[in-house]
Amino acid sequence: MTVDYKNTLNLPETGFPMRGDLAKREPNMLKSWYEKDLYQKIRQASKGKKSFILHDGPPYANGTIHIGHAVNKILKDIIVKSKTALGYDSPYIPGWDCHGLPIELKVEGLVGKPNQNISAAQFREACRQYAAEQVEGQKKDFIRLGVLGDWDNPYLTMNYHTEANIIRAFGKAVENGHLYKGSKPVHWCLDCASSLAEAEVEYEDKVSPSIYVRFSAVDSDAVLAKFNATDKGTGNISAVIWTTTPWTIPSNRAIAIHENLDYQLVQFNDERVILAKDLVEEVAKAAGVEQVVILGESKGKDLEWLRFQHPFYDFSVPFILGDHVTTDGGTGLVHTAPDHGHDDYIIAQKNGIEMAGLIGNDGLFKADVPFFAGKGVFESNDLVVAKLQEVGAMLKFSKIKHSYPHCWRHKTPIIFRATPQWFIGMEKQGLRQQALSEIKKVRWIPDWGQARIEKMVENRPDWCISRQRTWGVPVALFIHKETEELHPRTVELVEEVAKRVEQKGIQAWWDLDTAELLGADADNYIKVPDTLDVWFDSGSTYYSVVKDRPEFNGQEADMYLEGSDQHRGWFMSSLMLSTATDNKAPYKQVLTHGFTVDGQGRKMSKSIGNIVTPQEVMDKFGGDILRLWVASTDYTGEISVSDEILKRAADAYRRIRNTARFLLANLNGFDPKRDLVKPEEMMVLDRWAVDCAYQAQNEIKDAYDNYQFHAVIQRLMKFCSIEMGSFYLDIIKDRQYTTKADSLARRSCQTALWHIAEALVRWIAPVLSFTADEIWQYIPGERGEFVFTEEFYNGLFALDANEQMNDAYWQQVITLRNEVNRVLEQARNDKIIGAALEAELTIYANDTYAPLLAKLQNELRFVLLTSKAEVKPLADADVAEGEVKGFAVKVVRSANHKCPRCWHYSDSKDAESLCSRCDENVNGQGEVRQFA
């Protein structure tokens, strides 16, 4: 009769499910986290610890979140959770950017334009309501990602208190002397009818006219004298410029040349032209000129103030010197329209040349402009070309495809246009140099970020902070009606406005009666009607939020983390404002991540059909798979996502979950209070396993601390798959299942598993937050309610320095065991054995390996998972060495009976009898293990 020995075994048992079923389980966990006020419990547990402040860059409150948003928020959450585990107080206050044009456009579609279909005050209220709805929608999606934060009290740039603080930051910049009003060229969107910030400009390919234009010399003799032309040549003399914006020719007021460049007067067929020496050949080829004769040469500095007739207006323009002129293309003579180019404006100002002011806010030529009155700028391209051809000023016309600035919102070409605006001056009070100095004090991750933002700061123009919009924080200034000078009490008045905005929001500014603040002065001053650039809103959050929120205790932000496009966006605006108000950078570290692309490296696009949404991923795989994908990726470059890539993340997840389940199942019946074994009493292999976890934890903590999350996952997978899965957990099954339930051999093993589980759950919590919370509920022993309030486990220990069977020892054993497994696999293929336990091994080892294996005595077979293993000198070998030199393995099939309980082949009397080891474990005192 066959006896069932199942009840005599310590079989693994746990309520922790094998399948994650994340898409179904995670929402219930979120509900529990919210009901139990998890975020505030983390705050309480962290009170008094050193702080780490990651300041959330506000996403725009418009539309649903995309995969890039998910990457960004998950990276932030991993950092905040890992910093908490590393012993920091790391509050997370999510925020939203709520003012600005995109919301205005949406609301216009719903209620009409302000001051046409609806009052401006009603329009602002509609914008506020719309933004609030968008925030709620995005908030739900961010929470679903498993991101922990103060979601009940986020910062919104439209909160009255925040709006007031934005005005206060503005007032501080004014007080420190960084503000001025000027008419200078800014990016102008014809569709927005407003100026744009640098960060609101995108570059796309556009086909434009490419024209070479003649400006005839006013005094030909003066030109010939400057060029020392002995051969004077024949025909009209003209300076030739090149441009792709014919519509700016009416605004031309000068031609720029470089003082150190060589210029030549050359005969082109029957006319004479002035060109940079290095570009003569190129221009001749472009214009189809075959006969070229050099008539004279001169340095640019000697040609200054020569005058040339405007092609179709009755005035002349001078040659002026400019450092921006190069010979990279064109003619080396630069068409200069001060209204429509940054360099043009700077050089015109320097030379006392006034702007033309021909284009209105609507993008049309003003009514008094000859030839082009009432025409739009882009339609005027053809008209200007026709006019140039009519007057004989066109040397060459063609078309060119080139990169051209477009509005980020409308995707339409924009123009440079001079308008009266308010600016933060880069050279005022040494702002540019101070900002460059502050950049060097910041840690940039990856480090190329430093050079990138330095170059941007070096080259950026003054910051146009005013907008002609309705939904935005006001430029809260009073200016004199006649002189346009600021009121002498401006700083004080800005604070008075801020106090009112704090009570009633930005509408308080437009409702404000000037006399209320200015008294008798009210008749002489007007309120500025403009709003602040939304980049001022978000750029001032170091002031309006970080300095203000009590959770931050007046500390500055340790980290800003956004996509790499924010070097010219939020990182830039924050740096400029903080330097202007506080003379320092607002952050200590700046981390940037790349953009998401598909598996083939292509941008996400509706037309390609390769868009992956976070909502779809979570519905299919669950939030933890999305989080694991983010953590596994080197975020410093492009971040690839596809179904295949997510499936790989799901496979890795299963390995981690299976490891956790094995640990939990084998902790069945273990009470750490009662059963924990002291380190010195544990089996050597168990001590080594804890040491493995100890070493892994040090590396994982270091990787978290340095934001190397892919290194965290790699180390975690190595630990689960190799150190534990294919070695330790494999070996301990026999001891765990077959020894006496309360034996030292089993409790030692469970002690190791318990320590490892306590460590592992904390390692994965910043990334696999839902799964960690689930594991936490199943680990035996008293514990806090949530893993997220805990620091990394401090109960691990390293092997004693005097331990002979140290890590180096076990690494050698693993190498030899891998060789044994190779030989066993061959024996299986050769049908010598089926399962490994059918094998009896004779190992022939040299003087290095023999003593090493001998240390394990009769427990070597348990390490090798065979029924018998004996070691003999290599000289006795009757089989060849394998892949490890000095080591040979002979496999024979055991002739013994298989024990019905432990399945080892040994000294059982018959197939139904227990082996002596199992008999001792079932009926006696229990076997004694020393090593494994």
Curated annotation (Swiss-Prot):
Q: How is the cofactor bound?
A: Binds 1 zinc ion per subunit.
Residue positions of motif 'KMSKS' region: 603-607
Q: Where is this motif: 'HIGH' region?
A: 59-69
The UniProt entry, under PROSITE patterns, shows: AA_TRNA_LIGASE_I
What is catalysed by this protein?
tRNA(Ile) + L-isoleucine + ATP = L-isoleucyl-tRNA(Ile) + AMP + diphosphate
- A Pfam match: tRNA-synt_1
Q: Where in the cell is it found?
A: Cytoplasm
Give the EC number(s) under which this enzyme is classified: 6.1.1.5
- Sequence positions that bind ATP: 606
Which InterPro entries does the record associate with it? aa-tRNA-synth_I_CS, aa-tRNA-synth_Ia, Anticodon_Ile_BEm, Ile-tRNA-ligase, Ile-tRNA-ligase_type1, Ile-tRNA_ligase, M/V/L/I-tRNA-synth_anticd-bd, Rossmann-like_a/b/a_fold
Q: Name the positions where Zn(2+) binds.
A: 899, 902, 915, 918
Enzyme kind, highest EC tier: ligase
GO BP of this protein: isoleucyl-tRNA aminoacylation
Q: Does the keyword Transmembrane apply?
A: no
Any notes on this protein's domains?
A: IleRS has two distinct active sites: one for aminoacylation and one for editing. The misactivated valine is translocated from the active site to the editing site, which sterically excludes the correctly activated isoleucine. The single editing site contains two valyl binding pockets, one specific for each substrate (Val-AMP or Val-tRNA(Ile)).
Q: Which NCBIfam families match?
A: ileS
Q: How does it assemble?
A: Monomer.
Q: Which PANTHER family match?
A: ISOLEUCINE--TRNA LIGASE, MITOCHONDRIAL, SOLEUCYL-TRNA SYNTHETASE
Q: Which family does it belong to?
A: Belongs to the class-I aminoacyl-tRNA synthetase family. IleS type 1 subfamily.
What job does this protein perform?
A: Catalyzes the attachment of isoleucine to tRNA(Ile). As IleRS can inadvertently accommodate and process structurally similar amino acids such as valine, to avoid such errors it has two additional distinct tRNA(Ile)-dependent editing activities. One activity is designated as 'pretransfer' editing and involves the hydrolysis of activated Val-AMP. The other activity is designated 'posttransfer' editing and involves deacylation of mischarged Val-tRNA(Ile).
Q: What is this protein called?
A: Isoleucine--tRNA ligase
